[in-house]
């Protein structure tokens, strides 16, 4: 109904994880814009919404990106829907584990070593052919030195 009301150049976004699958399916059908999910990842909503069989390809991010691109291209939506090339949850978990290893091996300068953490994030993003920008959480006069916000490049399915 909203695409009919506002047109196909309307972008839709939801922070409700349970709504990602029906949202993706509806946007694909109606031809609207889907910038990305609340938790950007090729695995978040896309496989079920597009009918992609993941069997035998669990954890294969490039397979998933290629499969999504194929489905979006069939529907003429490859330039109107996106995600991240690196699943955000996988990135956070892998970075946390790698940082913990560095910490346990005495390769950090104590409780939190921002340079080591940043280099780990940069390395993991680069492995997926993308970049990740880190920024510290700020709210007015409050700036938290150990609370980072992540922003990776959008994956362009039209390329």
Place the predicted regions along the sequence by residue.
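A residue-level marker of the well-folded mature domains of exported/periplasmic proteins
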Residues: 1-159
